[in-house]
Amino acid sequence: MRAYSTVKKNFHYGAPGLGDRVHSILLSYNYGLLENTQVMLHLTKYQWNRHKPESWPEILSLFPRGSVAIMPHLDYEPISNQDFVDYIKQKGYSNAEGQIYGDYPQRFEPKQGVDLTKYLKHFPQLSAEDCSKDLNLPKKFVTVQWDSTSKRRSMDNNWQAKILSKYKGYEVVTVGGQADNELLRNSLKHIAYAMTKAEYHVGIDSGFLHLSQVYFAPENIHIYTTSPKNRWSHHMHRAKDNGIKINDGIN
């Protein structure tokens, strides 16, 4: 993991959102799969605080056992991204590398590291643990998620209704913070199971955009935004490049 933010100067990167953590493990899984190698994700103490010691293992449990390992380093204070890589190498991991994105580099993107852009073009479409005893899902449905910690990314009720009118014939199963079902609100394995049974995922730029990339083909992920293209996150630009539908059929 990178130790410092690519958008804020000299700011520790803590993987604060669910999407940050899902993205990191999906990226690690894809790298290991495509390079036929074991992957260990090294974390700083800022990536292992608050609720994160419980969150990381929950996300890992969605992936094949042993495909990705994580190791937090709680006693080290990195002074830069490369300093953290050098520290990991000194701990005996001689092949440790930093991560960069060559397609949409951010303002403080590191200069050294492996360009991981191509590994996000793979959509593994994993299976999920059978949760059918816990969930009574419709026969034909889409998973939907609108809530976000960012008001800029959220959709108001009028936009939601306009978008969902495109999906006539499908029932709506809401996942995430607005779900009525507690399991679909708080349990990733149940949300994952619902996604594997859904025809499409419909939503916004959020943690569930990243989670959907574990289970859906890109053309079956439909993301909507009211932001102009020059305000999109690098995740949104990359999603469009990789075949995810953005604002499809909405003017």
Regions found by a protein language model. Give the residues of each.
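Short, flexible/disordered intra-domain loops and linkers
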Residues: Y46-E54, K151-N158, E182-L183
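N-terminal pre-catalytic "stem/leader" segment of glycosyltransferase-like enzymes
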Residues: M1-E58
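A glycine-rich helix N-cap at a beta->alpha junction
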Residues: T44-A96
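Hydrophobic beta-strand segments of well-ordered beta-sheets in folded domains
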Residues: R2-F11, N36-L41, G66-A69, K91-G98, ...
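A nucleotide-sugar donor-handling region in carbohydrate enzymes
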Residues: L74-F141
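Nucleotide-sugar donor-binding patch of glycosyltransferase catalytic domains
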Residues: Y46, R50-L62, V68, Q213-N251
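Donor-binding and catalytic core of enzymes assembling or modifying cell-surface/extracellular glycoconjugates
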Residues: L18-L26, S148, D156-N157, A161-N242
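Conserved donor-binding/catalytic core segment of Leloir-type glycosyltransferases
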Residues: P138-K151
